[in-house]
Amino acid sequence: MRHRMKRHRIGRYGSHRKATLRNLSREIVEHGSIITTTPKAKAVQIFFEKLMTKAVKAKKADKKEREVALRREIFKALGDRRLVNKLVDEIAPKYLDRQGGYTAIYKVGPRRGDGAEMSLIKLVIEE
């Protein structure tokens, strides 16, 4: 029975899944959007939304200690100081008044080689 099994496993064991989510999140921070399979897009959306929430909280933090702690948590997930700075200093200020929903998934059709359903996941930026 699969009661209460909410985790998106995406066909990988734990450390491989963690690495995949980390790499996809890094690409979203670096490029703003990526095209990947739909199950991976749904899994990385959950992971990335939590990172964005931490980045927004770090930007809103009134104490320097709280901001540093949140930046360290983001660094633990991304593993690159340059990307942490970009996420907190450049991307997060655009979402200070937003209560979540930082990304959107758009289906783009099947992949040519094997027919896997592909999706575009991108940051939602309001003008």
UniProtKB/Swiss-Prot annotation:
InterPro entries per UniProt: Ribosomal_bL17 (IPR000456), Ribosomal_bL17_sf (IPR036373)
GO MF term list: structural constituent of ribosome
Keyword field contains Ribosomal protein: yes
Gene3D superfamilies named among the record's database cross-references: Ribosomal protein L17 (3.90.1030.10)
Pfam families recorded: Ribosomal_L17 (PF01196)
GO cellular component terms given for this protein: cytosolic large ribosomal subunit
Keywords, comma-separated and alphabetical: Ribonucleoprotein, Ribosomal protein
GO biological process, one term: translation
UniProt-listed PANTHER family: LARGE RIBOSOMAL SUBUNIT PROTEIN BL17M, RIBOSOMAL PROTEIN L17
Quaternary structure note: Part of the 50S ribosomal subunit. Contacts protein L32.
Similarity comment: Belongs to the bacterial ribosomal protein bL17 family.
Protein name as annotated: Large ribosomal subunit protein bL17
Organism listed in the record: Thermosipho africanus (strain TCF52B)
Gene name, Swiss-Prot/TrEMBL: rplQ
